[in-house]
């Protein structure tokens, strides 16, 4: 009798664990490619999501979603600090392999991210891709502080905000009037060009124009000055005499 009771309890425990495991798998959130494309096209809605392309860097550079940053699955654990502010917000992960995406979702969840969704893979859905690199605020700030490399900054904000403060050596551009953009660009199309605006939308327009003009190393700030208090230099044109 005792043996039968023990067997019944054991079977019940195994069944419970199995059901829990099945429940976890089936409750994993998934996003259709069509929906993710719509989010990327909506300048306001995209602000509510952090989209991470977890393919390797080479695949990312061949083309990726407009507002997606690149963190390969193998590098997620050591890159958490860069995206820690998104722990309580919506995060969407995609790649060219469902297993990579699943692993990335699991890693982010273990690191405390509460709302992680997997999207259809690039093999399952034909996404609209761009070829410029999208940087999160952490990496863009690093670029601002790095004075050793030969890079160019373009500021796509209104002139009044540009005049107040901007990246060292930055040039102000109007995303709605790019006819004369070529005249302020370096001749060497391998030159790294970094762009920013208020929320990444205007600068993404200019970024695409640069790609169309043949520039190879274009970097757009996902987070603009409304979302991140970047450490900019005060514009020389607006500095009070005797204060420098």
Label every PLM stretch briefly:
Residues 2-8, 22-39, 45-49, 56-90, ...:
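Rhodanese-like catalytic fold shared by cysteine-dependent sulfurtransferases
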Residues 16-19:
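Bacterial Sec-type N-terminal signal peptides, specifically the leucine/valine-rich hydrophobic h-region
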Residues 10-13:
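Gram-negative bacterial Sec-dependent N-terminal signal peptides
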């Amino acid at each position: 009798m005792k043996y039968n009771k023990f067997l019944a309890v054991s079977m019940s425990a195994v069944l419970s664990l199995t059901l829990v495991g099945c429940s976890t798998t089936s409750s994993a959130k998934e996003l259709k490619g069509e929906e993710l494309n719509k989010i990327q096209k909506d300048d306001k809605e995209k602000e509510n999501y952090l989209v991470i392309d977890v393919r390797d860097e080479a695949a990312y550079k061949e083309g990726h979603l407009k507002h997606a940053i690149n963190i390969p699955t193998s590098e997620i654990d050591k890159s958490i600090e860069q995206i820690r502010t998104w722990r309580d917000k919506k995060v969407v992960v995609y790649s060219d392999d469902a297993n990579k995406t699943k692993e990335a979702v699991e890693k982010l969840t273990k690191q405390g991210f509460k709302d992680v969704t997997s999207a259809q893979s690039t093999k399952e859905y034909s996404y609209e891709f761009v070829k410029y690199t999208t940087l999160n605020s952490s990496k863009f700030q690093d670029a601002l502080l790095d004075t050793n490399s030969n890079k160019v900054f373009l500021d796509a904000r209104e002139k009044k905000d540009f005049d107040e403060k901007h990246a060292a050596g930055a040039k102000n551009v109007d995303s709605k009037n790019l006819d004369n953009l070529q005249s302020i660009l370096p001749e060497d199309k391998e030159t790294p060009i970094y762009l920013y605006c208020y929320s990444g939308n205007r600068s993404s327009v200019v970024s695409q124009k640069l790609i169309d003009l043949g520039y190879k190393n274009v970097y757009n700030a996902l987070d603009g000055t409304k979302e991140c208090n970047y450490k900019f230099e005060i514009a020389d044109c607006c500095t009070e005499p005797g204060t420098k």
